[in-house]
Amino acid sequence: MALYPRLDDLLELRHQARTLGLASHHLVNSSFSGLYASVFRGTGLDFEEVREYHEGDDIRNMDWKVTARTNSPHLKTFREERERSVLLCIDQGPHMSFGTRGTFKSIQAARTAALLGWAANSLNDRVGGLLFGGQANSAHHFRPTKDRRALWRLLKALSGPIEGIEPAKDPLLNALQRAERGTATGSLIFVIADLNREITSLEATIGRLSQRHSLVLVPIDDKADRDLPDLGRALFTDHAGNLVEIETGDESGRDSYRTAWEQTRQFLAGVANRLRIPLIPVSTDEDVHQSLMRGMRQARRLQ
């Protein structure tokens, strides 16, 4: 099984992006096109008109004055601002070369970035990328632009490994700090990464980013992150690059492993909830398009 997707497959995802809710210039109250705008607040909406309510419309946009005057439900409709900058921060560390069901994390991360990138590009937004974790002491940066050829170059980079080795210091923290320094205020930033790790060291940077930007966390998960299979004694590599031997046949050990994962995810969810950051997990055994749609619907209900 390949560790990375074919470039042609990432290019084909532009067709699915049309139904994701980002790539529509229709009024944003319709069931799909309204989803993205209503979840990722702070991108800016321009008032369009008042019209009659249709089934499936977002009732939070009801115009109660017109409804009372006409004795018929009406709501305000909006269009998104003409453009914004979207930055896709994508984890390409060695831990992304992992997957026990469906496919590898690296492939799901690339598919996620492709769907979001195509959708944003179709809205005439500036799309850029920050690929981290695969090159010593640096990250590959793609400046946000509306040029579709630049998006093609980003997707091409995602269709293969980044040359180099994992840096000793925290590559995700470095990427977030680089995004903090180099991204225009008011941008929409997606962090597409393996977040099954210690989060405390990231909390302050995530908080500062969320104050200046619309931030979205997309953890790339595998079932084995939570439920360790019985493989006997096995060697694993942690996020620091250290080899760790685990006796996976021990039921109590697997329970401790599951508890540790749950505590880590609960802490991440708590940070996201406190900072009002959407948290949209994507698993290796799920369809990326469906995962994003489900995650956005859940995030909207929590707003």
Regions found by a protein language model. Give the residues of each.
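Exposed, interaction-prone extracellular/peripheral surfaces
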Residues: 1-36, 52-57, 66, 71, ...
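A positional/architectural concept
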Residues: 40-44
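N-terminal juxtadomain amphipathic helix
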Residues: 59-61
